[in-house]
């Protein structure tokens, strides 16, 4: 005999916004593989400099910023977006606040990474370690990050539980810092 406390498939369980979460998770894997592959290529160039084939955008100096930005911002950024969006929905027991804005954060971040992939090997940088991207890309990063903060903190604002889980405090601090 079934217990009445078991939730049936037709009960009013919250339906979460997982499309954006899956997109960020998939891209984190893709960017992780690509970023680390570029790292292997530039490591090999330290031993065999001729691996750049005489093409300027394949030189160590052009590929190293691409590698660091791909691993830090593409892989790490997508992993942060995916995990924070997943966790905030489940700990607050609500869908993401402003669903279309959450989709903008995904496509905006993909555009940021695409712009970095094009501009860094071409040598368009600000020549600042870990802040190489040109100012138009910086503006897009800012727009995406502000949208991210709105979605994340908006989701916390409409939560159905009284307390805020500690994981959300850490994600919130990371977003603000």
Where are these regions (language model features)?
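Short, intrinsically disordered terminal tails adjacent to the first/last structured region
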Residues: 1-10
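Hydrophobic cores of alpha-helical transmembrane segments in multi-pass integral membrane proteins
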Residues: 2-3, 22-124, 135-157, 167-177
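Cytosolic juxtamembrane amphipathic/interface segments immediately preceding
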Residues: 9-23
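Hydrophobic, small-residue-rich membrane helices and short re-entrant helix-turn-helix hairpins
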Residues: 16-19, 160-166
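Extended, aromatic/histidine-rich regions of cofactor-dependent oxidoreductases associated
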Residues: 127-131
